[in-house]
Swiss-Prot record:
Catalytic activity reported: ATP + H2O + 4 H(+)(in) = ADP + phosphate + 5 H(+)(out)
Organism this protein belongs to: Spinacia oleracea
Name of the protein in its database record: ATP synthase subunit beta, mitochondrial
Enzyme superclass (EC): translocase
Compartments it resides in: Mitochondrion; Mitochondrion inner membrane
UniProt gene name: ATPB
Keyword Kinase recorded: no
Quaternary structure note: F-type ATPases have 2 components, CF(1) - the catalytic core - and CF(0) - the membrane proton channel. CF(1) has five subunits: alpha(3), beta(3), gamma(1), delta(1), epsilon(1). CF(0) has three main subunits: a, b and c.
Any one GO biological process: ATP biosynthetic process
Family: Belongs to the ATPase alpha/beta chains family.
Alphabetic keyword roster: ATP synthesis, ATP-binding, CF(1), Hydrogen ion transport, Ion transport, Membrane, Mitochondrion, Mitochondrion inner membrane, Nucleotide-binding, Translocase, Transport
Molecular-function annotations in GO: ATP binding
GO cellular component: mitochondrial inner membrane; proton-transporting ATP synthase complex
Keyword Lyase recorded: no
Main localization category: mitochondrion
């Protein structure tokens, strides 16, 4: 996923 999509998550996308 792009950085912009990850920004929506409250924490890290890997968590």
């Amino acid at each position: 996923a792009s950085s912009a999509a990850a920004a929506x998550a409250p924490s890290t996308p890997l968590a």
